[in-house]
């Protein structure tokens, strides 16, 4: 097959004062040119966007509170009818991640966020042969999160700890689809429901984009300014010990700048792919870290349960891992 020609595109990143070169297929060049310009225009977080996102998070908290009542399904997999539920449990125990896109509504209506996009995803993984205490201790080992979650977390530090509440610092870093880094602070609260169930809620208190993402000590851009790739983030963990291990579920709710409607048809699938990859990496890194803590053997990045979106390695027999489609069904 003949390779398609590419254009070298040079455009200015106004948030960093740099000129950037990239290559894209000729067929998409003229379609993407306006979007490339928009992506490099600085975005500023507005109060109306913050208020709408806070409203979405409040509604999500209320929904999750109802889901955690005694007798309610603890994991989203438990809400599925049989035999689909048992099939997914079997796949989880074989090493598969189950990931789906979520959406909190009010009175069957979407919660609109002006000038912003909400990225809400839920994922579940199973870690065999470990206890709930071990899984929770890994999540609370914040000084070593840079080891557990590298390269996505470049720096980490526990700032304060009182009872079941932690204040932490994390420096996020990604080099794809474009290089970006953030200094962030979170407040995390843990609740032990009973001997086999625990939950946590992490809410961002501060997110600032770095002016030069390749430099860990780079000056920050003012909070709420920059490219607008990440303005707010909340993560909710649920841990359940059963079936000889621990099921881990994480809900991630993030806020970013919006995408102009004219480009949504092209950009939204890319956003979904990146969001799904990010959550898959979070779950897989957590599982790998818990397994390493439980066995005393450091699991490498060649661990056989790698999500296919994160590696080109051929899956190991009987440990083929897939990511669930948005409707909860495994991808074909």
Give the positions of each predicted feature.
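N-terminal secretory signal peptides that target proteins for export/translocation
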Residues: 1-22
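General secretory precursor processing signal
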Residues: 12, 25, 42-43
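Eukaryotic helix-grip
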Residues: 43-332
């Amino acid at each position: 097959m003949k390779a398609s020609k590419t254009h070298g595109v040079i455009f200015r990143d106004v948030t960093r004062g740099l000129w950037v070169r990239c290559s894209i297929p000729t067929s998409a060049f003229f379609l993407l040119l306006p979007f490339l310009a928009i992506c490099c225009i600085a975005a500023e977080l507005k109060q109306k966007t913050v208020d709408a996102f806070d409203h979405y998070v409040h509604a999500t908290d209320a929904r999750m509170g109802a889901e955690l009542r005694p007798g309610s399904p603890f994991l989203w997999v438990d809400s599925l009818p049989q035999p689909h539920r048992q099939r997914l449990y079997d796949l989880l125990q074989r090493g598969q991640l189950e990931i789906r896109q979520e959406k909190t509504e009010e009175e069957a209506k979407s919660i609109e966020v002006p000038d912003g996009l909400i990225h809400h995803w839920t994922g579940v993984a199973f870690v065999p042969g470990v206890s709930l205490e071990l899984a929770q201790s890994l999540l609370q080992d914040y000084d070593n999160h840079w080891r557990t979650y590298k390269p996505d977390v470049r720096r980490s530090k526990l700032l304060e700890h009182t009872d079941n509440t932690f204040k932490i610092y994390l420096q996020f870093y990604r080099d794809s689809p474009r290089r970006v880094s953030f200094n962030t602070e979170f407040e995390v609260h843990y609740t032990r429901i009973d001997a086999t169930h625990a939950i946590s809620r992490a809410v961002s208190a501060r997110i600032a984009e770095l002016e030069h993402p390749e430099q860990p000590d780079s000056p920050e851009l003012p909070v709420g300014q920059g490219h607008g790739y990440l303005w707010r983030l909340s993560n909710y963990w649920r841990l359940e010990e059963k079936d000889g291990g621990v099921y881990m579920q994480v809900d991630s709710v993030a806020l970013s700048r919006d995408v102009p409607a004219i480009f949504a048809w092209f950009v939204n699938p890319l956003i979904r792919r990146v969001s799904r990859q990010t959550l898959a990496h979070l779950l897989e890194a957590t599982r790998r870290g818990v397994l390493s803590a439980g066995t005393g053997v450091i699991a490498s990045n060649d661990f056989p349960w790698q999500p296919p979106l994160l590696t080109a390695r051929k899956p190991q027999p009987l440990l083929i891992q897939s990511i669930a489609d948005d409707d909860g069904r495994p991808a074909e």
